[in-house]
């Protein structure tokens, strides 16, 4: 299981609203390619880019930028962020 859950913070909400990005907490050994494939297959979107950070608790945070054709707010509402 590559993606554990969406990350819902104030910064994540700003990224979603203004930059068309979603944030997820992922398995620490997941690669950017693994994360992109999981996001594209689970949420039926196209990924433009991914930035990752390893958090202090050992999990990996992935910041996923969606293509211009996909709306991050619509995807977030489908997966239950709101």
UniProtKB/Swiss-Prot annotation:
GO terms for biological process: translation. Keywords: Ribonucleoprotein, Ribosomal protein, RNA-binding, rRNA-binding. SUPFAM superfamilies: Ribosomal proteins S24e, L23 and L15e. InterPro entries: Nucleotide-bd_a/b_plait_sf, Ribosomal_uL23, Ribosomal_uL23-like, Ribosomal_uL23/eL15/eS24_sf. GO terms for molecular function: rRNA binding; structural constituent of ribosome. One of its GO terms (cellular component) is ribosome. Part of the 50S ribosomal subunit. Contacts protein L29. Binds to 23S rRNA. One of the proteins that surrounds the polypeptide exit tunnel on the outside of the ribosome. NCBIfam families: PRK14548.1, uL23_arch. HAMAP family: Ribosomal_uL23_A. Belongs to the universal ribosomal protein uL23 family. PANTHER family: 60S RIBOSOMAL PROTEIN L23A. This is Large ribosomal subunit protein uL23. It comes from Natronomonas pharaonis (strain ATCC 35678 / DSM 2160 / CIP 103997 / JCM 8858 / NBRC 14720 / NCIMB 2260 / Gabara). The lineage of its organism: Archaea, Methanobacteriati, Methanobacteriota, Stenosarchaea group, Halobacteria.
């Amino acid at each position: 299981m590559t993606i554990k859950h969406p990350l819902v913070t104030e910064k994540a909400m700003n990224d979603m609203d203004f930059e068309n990005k979603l944030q997820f907490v992922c398995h620490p050994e997941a690669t950017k390619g693994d994360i992109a494939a999981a996001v594209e297959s689970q949420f039926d979107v196209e990924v433009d880019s991914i930035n990752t950070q390893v958090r202090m608790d050992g999990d990996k945070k992935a910041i996923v930028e969606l293509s211009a054709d996909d709306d991050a707010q619509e995807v977030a509402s489908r997966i239950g962020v709101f």
